[in-house]
Regions:
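Short loop/turn segments that flank or connect secondary-structure elements
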Residues: 1-174
Length: 174
């Protein structure tokens, strides 16, 4: 059971989440566009932070709710371009205080989380796994995450624009 105490209530939502469960920065494949890679490389000076890997959950390959996502992100061999993970499943950029990348450098899918989305737009409901029960009374998720809907919509547009800059991936499931 999740309980908000006076001590935990002063923490950001992501920190409260991390006290209760594995987070979105752990055990999650983070898809990156070439634009994401350029931003991260320019910030870190590194180019060894991504790879092509099959999804942890094989059901991911069966999704058909966003044909554009499938067409531009999943290769014929079932792999996707994702951030590297440490041996325990943590994102390579997850540090003791959270993400080590500044918000404007983080992958676009990370900036959009905890919202699900498809090419048509951003869902009003949070993604499965986001512990909304840890929201402070009277606070909304966007407010708690310090997210602006207009900014999130811009990231969403940018994500799909960057994906479409590449040749579509020929995939048997489309």
């Amino acid at each position: 059971m999740f309980e908000i105490t006076p001590e935990s209530g002063s923490l950001p939502l992501c920190a409260r989440c991390a006290r209760h469960q594995r987070t979105c920065c752990q055990d999650t494949d983070v898809f990156v566009t070439w634009g994401d890679i350029d931003r991260i490389q320019n910030h870190t000076g590194r180019n060894d932070f991504h790879e092509y890997r099959a999804p942890v959950n094989p059901d991911y390959l069966a999704q058909d709710d966003d044909p554009t996502w499938v067409r531009y992100s999943i290769r014929p061999d079932g792999t996707r371009r994702v951030l590297l993970q440490r041996s325990g499943g943590d994102c390579l950029f997850l540090g003791m205080q959270g993400c080590e990348l500044p918000p404007d450098v983080r992958p676009l899918v990370c900036r959009l989380y905890p919202y699900d989305f498809d090419e048509a737009g951003i869902s009003e409901a949070p993604a499965q796994g986001c512990p909304v029960q840890l929201l402070l009374p009277g606070r909304q998720l966007m407010e708690e995450m310090d997210m602006d809907l207009a900014e999130a919509r811009q990231w969403h547009r940018q994500l799909y624009e960057e994906m479409k800059l590449e040749e579509p991936v020929p995939c048997a499931s489309v």
